[in-house]
């Protein structure tokens, strides 16, 4: 993982266009090929990012001489720019990062992460819900448990009665962190044209009021699971709010 703290401005060029004006930011380059831009707020959420696979081309501004500058460079206001980083994904979308000054540039090999280990109840809830997917509603079907994504596995990926994709996040005690996690998964999965549109279900034995409010505000359905009933019968009880 490479962490660069720099004064930079960023332009996203693709289906939409977005611009971040010059400011001090953290640029995070992970071993999986992802690139994300962070400010000193917003908790863990990046200002902009590019999911893997993508390529990174870094060019010194001093190497350009008049007409030799690439189109990506000449299109940008580049006074005082030291480097231009061009991050491109297979669809041709780009992050164009103009570096004015680098304050810190460090790289660390974190090795392979063992991943999040769920407690026994959460793991069993996931297993039981996958076996009794109709708890989520009539006509639901299971696509896969632990559906892999670039930011971690989705507990359960399913289809509803209309065939639409539904991502399910399972917790023993559902808090705001779980809703944020589901939000990240749904945002990422909706970028996949084969899965979109993707909605979310937040399922837990107990859902905290603040988490329920946030989940519903983001369009997620909340399901309270009866663990004892799920363990003891083929058809589990639940409460929908």
Curated annotation (Swiss-Prot):
Enzyme class, broadest EC rank: hydrolase
Pfam families, alphabetized: NucS_C, NucS_N
Disulphide-bridged cysteine pairs: none
Alphabetically ordered keywords of this record: Cytoplasm, DNA-binding, Endonuclease, Hydrolase, Nuclease
InterPro entries per the UniProt record, alphabetical: Endonuclease_NucS, NucS_C, NucS_N, NucS_N_sf, tRNA_endonuc-like_dom_sf
Record EC number: 3.1.-.-
Superkingdom classification of source: Bacteria
GO cellular component: cytoplasm
HAMAP family reported for this sequence: NucS
Family statement drawn from the similarity comment of this UniProt entry: Belongs to the NucS endonuclease family.
Protein role: Cleaves both 3' and 5' ssDNA extremities of branched DNA structures.
Protein name according to UniProt: Endonuclease NucS
Organism: Corynebacterium jeikeium (strain K411)
Gene that produces this protein: nucS
